[in-house]
Amino acid sequence: MALPTLPSNWHSRSRVLEQQIVRQREQEARLRHQWDQTNQYFKQSNVCSSKQAQWSSRQSYQKSMNAFHQEKQKEEKKKTLEYRREQLRKLLQEERDLLEEELKELRCNKEHNVSDMRQRTEELKSAREERQKQLAEELLYEQWKKNNVKLREVESSLFKKHVVDAWGEQITARNQEKEEEDMEKKRLENEYELARREAIERMKRDKEKRQQQEEELARVLKWQMEELKLKDLEAKKLKKEQEDLLRQQWEIEELEEERRKMEQCRKKTELSHFLSRQYNAQMKRRAQQVQEELEMDKKILSALISKEDEDQHLQSARREQAIADVAWMKHVIEEQLHLERQREAELDTLFREEAKQVWAKRETEWERERNARNRLMKEVLAGRQMQIQERIERNQLAQAESVMNRERLLRQLEEARQFTSREKKQEEEQKTARRTELEAQIAEQLLKGKEAIVQQEEEEKEFKLAEDLENDLLQQEAEIMTQRGYQKKTYSRPRTAWS
């Protein structure tokens, strides 16, 4: 007799404990590995964000712009220098050409006559005397201007006015320079504000995009989790159904074993009754035995009918056919049971010879009915066994498909988790980079403000120091001139003017 197949969850307690310990250790190792990965990830994120913030900071941008402006100024100076050099080369070339022409003229004029040279000498002498006379008149005029008190007062007032105008021009230039610095500072602030607004808008768009992606991912994850739960429920249901089918198969095998045992008992009883030759009692016992067999077959068929009613997922046509076959077999057995009871009631009225004849006749009928009943029961049990085997195969296929779907969903969930982790990592890196950039910009602005204040204070100190030094020099010069008194000025001999 084939033993029933045990389900997969009937293991010993020691093996269950070993599996639990192994799973616990694997989970601890997985958690440690995940913690190490997370720690390494945050370290790398900090390094990347710091470098990215340093490279994308306002200070780095300002350095790049300053270097660009300096390079541009150098190029402009270089172009200006080249232009001036070119102009100087042109002037030198023109002078060389003029000198060459003069030398050529001199070579040509050497052969002129002496009279022309004397005439030229007289003309030069008269021109020199005229210039000397004019220079003497100019010197006398300058001496008269210096010796005239009114003219000196006018010159002093003009000098004071010139000094005041020069101071005003310096103040105006300083104010203009300060206005230019303020305008440059305002321009930089406007550029910084514009860049900050653009960064805020970009951050806002990125945040909205990430929110949409997260919402879409959350919907997908929720759908996958629900599908995974359904697959788990389906797997549990299929497993339970397989256990029920195995149990039914085992029960059918037990029923067949009981019928075989009853058949053996019947044969032994027939042998003993045949030897006793007590026909009436033997027929009664035989009738009771047949009734017991019929009752047993009736119970088996009732159990099969109840099992068929429980199997709701079978195909309707096959299920109705199986129920109809079992019900018909049950009806036949009930009719035979009723007939045997009537036969048992007729035994009391029979004599010995009649009982012997009836016994032979009944024995033939019983044998024929038993063979027919056994054949029908075998067909019913074989059909039931085939149905259970088909359902077990379908259940195994469904379980395999459920396992594949569950593995696929788990892979998708793992991919979604990794994608979410990468998105969070990028978001943290961007936040850190923006925060570092803002801090660097604030520090740069504060440093520029301090440098501007220090530079302004130094310029004011230098300006005040130069003013004090000039006042001291003027006071010393005035004291020296007062101590010396008036001194007559001497003039050197004027240079001879040659054309």
Swiss-Prot record:
The keyword Ubl conjugation does not apply. Keywords: Coiled coil, Cytoplasm, Cytoskeleton. GO terms for biological process: apoptotic process. One of its GO terms (cellular component) is cytoplasm. Residues 17-143, 169-304, 405-485 form a coiled coil. It is found in: Cytoplasm, Cytoskeleton; Cytoplasm, Cytoskeleton, Microtubule organizing center, Centrosome. Residues 260-426 are annotated as: Trichohyalin/plectin homology domain. Pfam families: TPH. Its main location: cytoplasm. InterPro entries: CFAP53/TCHP (IPR043596), TPH_dom (IPR043597). Belongs to the TCHP family. May act as a 'capping' or 'branching' protein for keratin filaments in the cell periphery. May regulate K8/K18 filament and desmosome organization mainly at the apical or peripheral regions of simple epithelial cells. This is Trichoplein keratin filament-binding protein.
